[in-house]
A protein has these predicted regions:
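Active-site region of the double-stranded beta-helix
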Residues: 1-57, 72-118
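Histidine-centered metal-chelating micro-motifs
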Residues: 60-61, 65-70
């Protein structure tokens, strides 16, 4: 309940192996209870402000570029279904935002999750 997803912030908008692959991503969000809400952040460049989108139950968002973590309000649960459309034939390789990449060492299980995308 409450918290962040997609953090450390990452992107996958450029084919430049072995660092990153190009995959567009579509999310459909659900909240429990259904009157809950959240926010989808979109930051196109590290160190510069970006956009934020208010999410409600049933929101769908399509992302083709930028770092994109999301968060849910405290006391609510957020579920999402995501579809990745690869513009190359390779598995997903996420590029983590340099200013937050050190968090990869502090979040239990994150490296195991990343390994499953390959």
């Amino acid at each position: 309940e409450g918290g962040w997803s997609g953090f450390p912030s990452h992107k996958h908008d450029t084919d430049r192996l072995p660092l990153e692959t190009r995959h567009d991503e579509t999310y459909n969000f659900r909240f429990k209870p259904s009157h809950g809400s959240g926010v989808q952040m979109l930051q196109r460049e590290d160190g510069k402000s970006g956009d934020a989108y208010h999410l409600v139950d049933g929101s769908t968002i399509c992302l083709d570029s930028g770092y994109h973590p999301c968060a849910v309000l405290p006391g609510y649960q957020m579920y999402y279904f995501t579809i990745l459309g690869g513009l190359s034939q390779r598995s997903l390789v996420q590029y983590f935002q340099p200013s937050h990449a050190d968090q990869l060492e502090t979040i239990p299980g994150i490296k195991d999750m990343i390994a499953k995308f390959k």
